[in-house]
């Protein structure tokens, strides 16, 4: 009852009070913030209550129904550096992947795992001494007098804690929308996060869409001793963000600088602390990984679409092809996306990818094709 009152109150605030509801009010696109409580398994927070930030994009008409259509609920999972609300809900033109699917009738959620965006940030991430020494140098002398020894000499999060966060959000969404399964869309390190979660919870996952999944077929099957040694977290400056993108440009007009600038502004807004360090950086936890290997992916039967950007130098196309080949699902499609880097959702062929994902999430097929390679944008 409390949840129903909360939703009704929110919608009444978002729908204008003056005048009667119009026939098209059900097509109003909403943005709703949720905070999901989780008992953390992050070593620095073990056993403590943490909050996972979840953004929802949904049409008013869909939200008012309360219960969602069984195959129309989607959860986005981000990669190693960029929180989900920035990665998938870009605040410019038609570059929001979340909005595209929401306008197609999906109830769309995106989550930040612990250490990202608006979710709980473990305390070691507030100490620049916990950066690798090479990264500390950029903050001397403005933030640090000199390079310093770490107060927490271990990677902050791990794939197991990420899976724990994802499960908390999946359970929250299943209860909120009254569905048995949700579909997962993920990017980069989100591949092991969402793909690994799906492999272990195939009864909860409808379909998968994986953009540039960071697959390693020889990844260790079991966790090392945790927390694993190493820098606790990392940062990225604007110049590093731009340089990493530009090295992956392989065709003319691949991306619009205005989109790049909007994404960077949104990225800094998601990290108010990092925005004050030097000229402004985004912070992300170092994450220990294991598990999403040949054995795990080979046992996965969830229908899956994978997408490889032709010019991706972070997760090259042959690495995505390896994941596709090893996947145990019968229904699986590999999209070869032209003129695209690791940041395909912010580039010229984003609309082709968004539409391909909509088709897959709707029917488990791209056109009539349920398996094989599809080339788009050539």
Task: Please place each PLM-identified region on the residue numbering.
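N-terminal cap/lid segment of alpha/beta-hydrolase-fold proteins
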Residues: 24-69
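Short, surface-exposed "cap/lid" segments of acyl-processing enzymes
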Residues: 61-110, 120-125
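Alpha/beta-hydrolase active-site loop
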Residues: 129-176
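Alpha/beta-hydrolase fold nucleophile elbow
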Residues: 177-188
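Alpha/beta-hydrolase
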Residues: 218-307
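Conserved alpha/beta-hydrolase "acid-adjacent" motif
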Residues: 313-319
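Catalytic histidine neighborhood in serine/cysteine hydrolases
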Residues: 327-343
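Catalytic histidine-centered segment of alpha/beta-hydrolase-like enzymes
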Residues: 340-352
